[in-house]
Amino acid sequence: MEHTYQYSWIIPFIPLPVPILLGVGLLLFPTATKNLRRTWSFLSIFLLSIVMIFSLYLSIQQIIISCIHQNVWSWTINNDLSFEFGYFIDPLSCIMVILITTVGIFVLIYSDNYMSHDQGYLRFFAYMGFFNTSMLGLVTSSNLIQIYFFWELVGMCSYLLIGFWFTRPIAANACQKAFVTNRVGDFGLLLGILGLYWVTGSFEFQDLFEIFNNLILNNRVNLLFLTLCAFLFFMGPIAKSAQFPLHVWLPDAMEGPTPISALIHAATMVAAGIFLVARLLPLFIVIPSIMYIISLIGIITILLGATLALAQKDIKRGLAYSTMSQLGYMMLALGMGSYRSALFHLITHAYSKALLFLGSGSIIHSMEALVGYSPDKSQNMILMGGLTKHVPITKTAFLLGTLSLCGIPPLACFWSKDEILNDSLLFSPIFAIIACSTAGLTAFYMFRIYLLTFEGHLNTYFLNYSGKKSSSVYSISLWGKEDGKKINRNFCLVPLLTMNNKKGASFFSKKTYQINNNVRNQTLITVANCALNKKIYYYPHESDNTILFPMLVLLLFTLFIGAIGIPLNQEGFNILSKLFTPSINLLHKNSTNFVDWYEFFRNATFSVSIAFFGIFIAYWLYKPFYSSLLNLTLLNSFQKWSSNPSCWEKLINCVYNWSYNRGYIDTFYKKSLTESIRRLAKQINFFDKRIIDGITNGVGITSFFVGEFTKYIGGSRISSYLFLYLSYVSLFFLFLKILN
């Protein structure tokens, strides 16, 4: 066993050869490197598979032996300061390595097809390899210095991947926004690390926990200062895990390729903040005020993320706000001290959300044949609908992922979310009410996404999205704000469906399209005859097998991964508790695992009822519009049974505007911070150029003119120079005499 652990240091470096070789190859042998492009994807998958197998073996050993292994080497040694580096293998590290590698492998397989058209294919795999190395290094680090080093590398990789299509201004702005927002959190993290070192004198986790607990128990340190250091440290996870108020970067990060959203913004990078809080939880747990702040940030993020997801039209942004809300559940669990529940939900959510993001990528891939390659169109749920018969495999996978996130048994997220809801009932009634209500909102907005995408009829060909103009009720579209200027009202589906096309349709026409310097060979189905005398890209199609295979495997994880947390006997034994035994004993040394099955079924029935209520509301509000093809609006539906429609108008309009405008938080930051900083920068620039540079240039110009004037007076005669010199010296001495 010891012989196996001594090779754990190599885990972060196994995926590293791919980005290094790609960089060297593109620099020295660009043609040969590009010709072997598929080889690089295979090599990336192979190397990450090695890490996955190794991590699975370590996890099995953890379950059997239940131990923590650490090995460090000294970097610098002196009397005052000592830096060490090494690796730290415990259940948390094993779980995170398995998550990173399993999701990473399937995302790489998916990306091989999804990114095949892109000229940045090799650059994409180089970034992905470097990102995997950074994440693996982060979760196996043995001290805070290593964690901060890999933490920054993860941030850099996310910046590169979010701005992968940097020629698009929106993507460039999104990666800058993510970078700047995370800088705020990372600055707090650095200050927190330095503060903890100043108090304890150590960066190593084991020493840090022991010294910190002794200082608290013996009352030998200022508790207020410790609380400040812990809060500054917590700012890093707030930004990285998109918690309020540093969550604003996550929806804009969807401008990157969809595989990036599945890997970084579902399973790995945003989970890094949860991982860091879980790693330092023995430190936080002795400061009650910090635990309350963590839980408060979590509950605010839960509610905020759910409400902001209600009116999103972009399918990926809707899933992004869902991710934000679910990360809030994990943070709430950590703030309540529910270590096991938080990590259990981290596992189940990672696989379910990765499945949903890959499913959204398959949907976008199929919609591009109809609406083009603009994200504003291919990701817009306004233009979707009726995709069930066109992409049945994607639909099934997406539906099961949606049901899992809603908390429907026996899917994965049901087991973990139910634990968090039960723990919240014991922690705070107010928090429990908010958490349970948000569970219903989660079911509502997730089924809203599903119904808008797959049910009804293909909305691309609809003439009117917003309802009847003559309606007496204030009209709010189910799909979002009315924007008549962008709707092509000359495009009609009726001639296409009723025409007698004797020539027939031409299938599988090979055409090449140029998108932002990226060439894609796409098979389209075109119609040769139409009343509009234009070619119409007909219906979506199912994705290729290399896109569907990762989704189906993640679907299996979504179905069965929850079993690791299901009690197997009356004593509550399960695989997850056995794996987390060392960490659980550290937090709750006298805890018991007895299971009350009656209480479990009662609480489960309550949480499932809330989820089904949210699903029913979503189905009731959205499904009839597709089944009957009636051109109604949301408020018109309320008018059928509401005796006072004006109240509903104001309420729904208020909720819609709040959600559509992102809670006005982005606007607040723009007005109060961005514009203020820009005005300050302009004033500083003016002061620098006009005042600072003006003084410097003025001295030079003055010296020049004084010299010219002196030369003119002297007339190039030595006697004149001597006379002026003596005159100045005499005046100087006279001035000194007057002063004395």
Curated annotation (Swiss-Prot):
Superkingdom of the source species: Eukaryota
Broad class of enzyme this protein falls into: translocase
One GO term describing the cellular component: chloroplast thylakoid membrane
Catalytic activity: a plastoquinone + NADH + (n+1) H(+)(in) = a plastoquinol + NAD(+) + n H(+)(out); a plastoquinone + NADPH + (n+1) H(+)(in) = a plastoquinol + NADP(+) + n H(+)(out)
GO-annotated molecular function: NADH dehydrogenase (ubiquinone) activity; quinone binding
Ranges that cross the membrane: 9-29, 40-60, 89-109, 125-145, 147-167, 185-205, 221-241, 258-278, 283-303, 327-347, 354-374, 396-416, 425-445, 547-567, 606-626, 718-738
PANTHER family: NADH-UBIQUINONE OXIDOREDUCTASE CHAIN 5
Family membership noted in the UniProt record: Belongs to the complex I subunit 5 family.
Subunit record text: NDH is composed of at least 16 different subunits, 5 of which are encoded in the nucleus.
UniProt name for this protein: NAD(P)H-quinone oxidoreductase subunit 5, chloroplastic
